[in-house]
Design a protein with these regions (language model features):
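Proline-rich low-complexity regions
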Residues: 5-8, 12, 68, 142, ...
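Small-residue-rich packing faces within the transmembrane alpha-helices of Major Facilitator Superfamily
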Residues: 13-16, 42-45, 91, 114, ...
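Alpha-helical multi-pass transmembrane bundles of energy-transducing inner-membrane proteins
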Residues: 27, 108-183
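Transmembrane helix-loop-helix hairpins at membrane boundaries of multipass inner-membrane proteins
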Residues: 2-6, 17-111
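Specific lipid-exposed transmembrane alpha-helices and their immediate membrane-water interface residues
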Residues: 10, 14-15, 49-54, 58, ...
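N-terminal transmembrane alpha-helices
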Residues: 5-9, 13-17, 117, 121, ...
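Generic enzyme active-site microenvironment
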Residues: 10, 74, 135
């Protein structure tokens, strides 16, 4: 079985976990590791794009469990194209963030950035609505943490507004998913 469809989720998960434990690394090492992880994600995305370019759809059942009990990842041309686009934008964003880094940034930025990529790429690959909700929540939690990165008073105030609006949106999303599954 080809395990490549899970790689866009595993790479940022592993990179983010390593970066969480790397608080004593020099900033340049964290920058380089995070950038290497994104370049690896771009390589995987391009490989997946090439694999589905002729039309086949890759389906990956985690743990061998079939739906509706298992988590299913689906890679089609749209998902693969969005993975490539995400990796390119992430690479450009990280290069910009590294260039603007004055050495005073908190060491958790790169880990949170990787976890945000985990949520985005998982949302593109998921094959059902409930797991789409789960990946959206992973994405939102990482974005809340990035927004609060630094704990300035204006950031906390802005984060409170974002969290309240996103909680309302998440509740409506979950209600919609429950209604769809209930039908």
């Amino acid at each position: 079985m080809n395990h490549l469809p899970i790689a866009p989720i595993l790479l940022p998960l592993i990179a983010g976990s390593v970066l969480l434990l790397s608080t004593r690394w020099p900033a340049t090492a964290r920058h380089a590791f995070s950038l290497a992880a994104i370049v690896a994600q771009l390589a995987v995305a391009l490989t997946l794009f090439a694999a589905v370019a002729d039309g086949p759809i890759l389906v990956y059942a985690l743990g061998g469990w079939a739906p509706p009990f298992g988590i299913v990842l689906v890679v089609d041309r749209l998902a693969a194209a969005l993975l490539v686009l995400t990796a390119i934008v992430a690479c450009a964003s990280l290069l910009y963030a590294v260039a603007r880094d004055t050495g005073t940034s908190a060491p958790r930025f790169h880990a949170l950035f990787q976890f945000q990529l985990l949520g985005i790429q998982g949302a593109f690959l998921t094959g059902d609505l409930f797991n789409l909700f789960v990946f959206f929540e992973v994405l939102l939690i990482a974005s809340y943490a990035l927004l609060l990165h630094g704990l300035a008073a204006d950031r906390v105030r802005a984060a409170l507004h974002v969290v309240v609006l996103n909680l309302i949106g998440s509740a409506l999303f979950l209600l919609g998913v429950a209604l769809i599954y209930g039908v």
